[in-house]
A protein has these predicted regions:
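Structural preference for solvent-exposed beta-strand-turn elements
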Residues: 1-324
Length: 324
């Protein structure tokens, strides 16, 4: 019998179970739990992505099991019990969670598990500005996941001297952003949106990204992730500077505004926008201000945001992905 702190085990299962929710074969719906000394590794792999998380303060004997991830997660939820007792049996484990007793199926590890292969990283990125990087990653993820084309369902990361470029496009929206990082290596990597999903679940102040010849690895807090890289991705990063240059004109209308004030104005307008047949927000660049507005025939909202402006213009855009 081996005893786990319930909340820590639930957290590790939540962080690591992403691949088990996208199984490509039957055994990929299972998670491997390995206990050695007083810590355990919870790991899931689906042939494309691998996630692992660590649980400490384990009491009892060492175990190595491949257990159904969703059933295990369900068995330890919605209880005030502080510990989970696991006893391995042939083809299953017995669980005791407070007064609750359950049985969860297992598979033989030797026949149904692929070990991680050690390899040398071509690129290393140490994120030094977590507060700036995570919002950029969230916006990029929101844009990329809306693409109707598989070859664009990714976020591109390009290390440069002292920072990284983050870029993506879904054919309608395009993002190109920069964030300070400690970098080593070069080249653009297309990270699948599924991997970005998992990265955002465990984005801590300590974030390390490593790129291999055909995979990307990510470490943050207690989570370790490794994902294959899309080989057939359509890269937008090399095209963006040329596209921006071709559309940029001297003294074209522009505005410098306070980010928080602008976001609050967009959120107010977007709440009204959702009742329009085609949700959109109107932005007007005027003298010393930017006006954000929307009406839906029932409600109208207008916000003036002080700005340092050049020229005047107006345009409409869908705001949900920016403020979401």
């Amino acid at each position: 019998m081996t005893s786990f702190p319930r909340q820590e085990l639930a957290k590790a299962l939540s962080e690591a179970s992403g691949p088990s929710k996208r199984p490509t074969q039957g055994q990929h719906a299972f998670t491997r739990i390995t206990v050695q000394d007083s810590s355990a590794t919870v790991e899931c792999y689906n042939g494309v992505m691998r996630c692992a998380s660590v649980v400490n303060a384990i009491v009892g004997s060492g175990i190595d099991i491949l257990v159904h991830a969703e059933m295990l997660q369900s068995a330890i939820e919605n209880t005030k019990a502080e510990s989970v007792e696991i006893t391995p049996e042939p083809n299953r484990i017995k669980l005791k969670v407070g007064s609750r007793v359950a049985s969860v199926p297992t598979l033989p590890v030797a026949d149904n598990w692929t070990e991680r292969q050690e390899r040398r990283a071509l690129t290393r990125i140490q994120v030094s500005n977590h507060d700036a990087f995570v919002p950029i990653l969230k916006i990029a993820h929101g844009i990329a996941k809306l693409s109707k084309f598989d070859d664009r369902k990714h976020v591109e990361i390009t290390p440069e001297n002292g920072h990284i470029r983050v870029a993506c496009s879904n054919g309608y929206q395009t993002l190109w952003a920069k964030c300070d990082c400690i970098t080593k290596g070069s080249g653009t990597t297309a990270v699948p949106v599924e991997a970005i999903d998992e990265m955002l679940k465990a984005a801590s102040s300590s974030m390390l990204i490593r790129v291999f010849d055909n995979a990307i690895a990510y470490n943050s807090g207690s989570l370790s992730l490794e994902s294959s890289i899309r080989a057939d991705s359509k890269l937008v990063t090399p095209m963006i500077p040329r596209v921006m240059e071709s559309h940029r004109k001297p003294d074209s209308p522009s505005a410098i505004v306070d980010r928080i004030e602008l976001i609050n104005a967009i959120k107010s307008a977007d709440s009204v926008s959702q009742k329009r047949a085609i949700p959109s927000v109107k932005v007007e660049i005027d003298i010393a201000k930017t006006v954000v507005s929307c009406d839906n025939s029932e409600t109208s909202v207008t916000s003036d945001v002080p700005a340092d402006t050049i020229g005047a213009t107006s345009f409409r855009f869908a705001a949900s992905d920016i403020v979401g």
